[in-house]
Amino acid sequence: MRKYAKFFVTPKGERAARGGHPWVFGEEVTKIEGEYANGDLVDVVTSKGKYLGTGFVNDHSKIRVRIISTNTNDKFDEAFWERRLRYALDYRLTVMGERDFNCCRLIFGEADMFPGLTVDRYNDLLVTQTLSLGIEMRKQMLFELLIKILREMGQEIRGLYERNDVRIRLLEGMEEGKHWFATDLCPEPGAVTTEIVENRSEERR
C-alpha cells in the first residue's frame, strides 16, 4: 500500500497528466485523501483512483502538484535522485562534448524531471535557481550529489551560487535571495566570474 496522500483530478487534469504534462493546477484537484504537508510527495490519481503520477505538493502555488515520476515502483530516496542526476549529466556530456560541457545548462527543470530547478555551469562555478518548494527542501542533498558526481566525472567544481532573487519564489511561499551555497567550495565573490569571462574570451580568439 502506498504511503502518499492521493489527489484526485478532473478529466482535464487526467488528460494532461496522461499526455505527459508535469503540472497539476489547483482547479484540477477535486478531492484529497490522506495527510500531507507542503513540499511532500503525493500521488495524483484519476476520479476512479487510478494512478497517474507522483509529485511535490504546494498549496501556496497555482501549480498544486509538480510531477516527478509516473512509475509506481520508484522509491524516492537518495539513490533515485543520484540516478536522475547522472542521467542528465551523462546526456549533456554525450550530446555537447567535453569542450562545451564546461559552460552549459546542466539541469533544465521539468525537462530533466527536476521541477523548478535550473543549474548552469560556468567552468568551475555552478549557478542554481530553485523555484519549487519540493526541490528547495531537498536541495542540500541534490547539490552535494551534483558536486560529487561532477568530480567523479573529472570535473573541477569550486563553487555553487544560488540565484533565487526572483518574485515567483514568493508566490510559492519561499523567500527571495542570492548567496553562496553552504559548503567549503565557496571562492571569493567575483573571483571566479572574472576568471570565467577571461577564459571564455581567450577561447573565442
Where in the sequence are the language-model features?
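Short helix/loop capping segments that flank catalytic or ligand/cofactor-binding pockets
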Residues: E33, G53, M137-R138, R205
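Short, charged, low-complexity patches
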Residues: E78, I135-K139, F143
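Structural motif
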Residues: V42, L125-L126, R158-L160
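A short interface-forming secondary-structure element
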Residues: N123-E136
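Non-catalytic substrate-recognition/targeting regions of SAM-dependent transferases
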Residues: G109-F114, T118-D120, Q140-R205
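Non-catalytic accessory regions of SAM-dependent methyltransferases
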Residues: M1-N123, F181, G190-V192
